[in-house]
């Protein structure tokens, strides 16, 4: 029996933010064929460095892994968005240092998943729904650098990518500035089901 395990953070472990509505894993189960299973190993608040421990607890029956992590790593580095600098070069150095540290942690997370020798799908970090337009624009620029790490890592290993920036693209997809609502969760679940079962048609293809 095919068995999808969701790894990572509150993109999947979003029950606390749905106002009583279904969480992502519940909605995913409703999207899958009857003979498929879905389990939640993701933990709200998890960072890339926590993924290896999640993978270690994955049941032997798992046949597919889906990873969405990085948002909390980004939150920990959010202070750089307001860091005073003397030049654009200084600003870019701050971003580069953050990217370098995140890349090491993210590649380790993916390596831990790949060690299970199962099909793996990874997700980008979505833009969120920050109410302040100026902050939102700065956050998107910084997240682009982190998402580049995710896409390059996926390309290096021939992995499929779910671009959550395109999936959760409306205000109602969010329960707050950073967490998916049940509406957004349904869209995430649909994307996961389509990729895992092969039922979906990619909206774009990337060759590397």
Give the predicted meaning of each segment:
Residues 1-46, 54-61:
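Serine-esterase "nucleophile elbow" of acetyl-processing enzymes
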Residues 53-208:
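Alpha-helical cap/lid subdomain in secreted, periplasmic
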């Amino acid at each position: 029996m095919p068995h999808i395990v969701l790894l990572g953070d509150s993109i999947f472990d979003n029950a606390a933010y749905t106002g009583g509505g279904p969480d992502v894993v519940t909605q995913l189960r409703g999207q899958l064929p009857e003979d498929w299973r879905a389990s939640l190993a993701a933990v709200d608040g998890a960072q890339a460095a926590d993924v290896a421990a999640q993978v270690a607890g994955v049941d032997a029956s798992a046949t597919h892994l889906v990873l969405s992590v990085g948002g909390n790593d980004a939150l920990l580095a959010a202070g750089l968005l307001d860091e005073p600098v003397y030049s654009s070069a200084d600003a870019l150095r701050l971003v580069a240092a953050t990217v370098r540290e995140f890349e090491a942690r993210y590649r380790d997370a993916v390596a831990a998943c790949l060690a299970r020798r199962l099909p793996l799908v990874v997700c980008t970090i979505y833009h969120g729904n920050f109410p302040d337009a100026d902050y939102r624009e700065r956050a998107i620029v910084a997240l682009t650098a982190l998402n580049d790490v995710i896409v390059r890592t996926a390309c290096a290993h021939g992995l499929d990518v779910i671009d959550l920036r395109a999936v959760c693209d409306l205000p109602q997809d969010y329960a707050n500035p950073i967490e998916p609502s049940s509406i957004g969760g349904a869209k995430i679940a649909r994307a996961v089901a389509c990729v895992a079962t092969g039922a979906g048609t990619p909206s774009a293809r990337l060759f590397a």
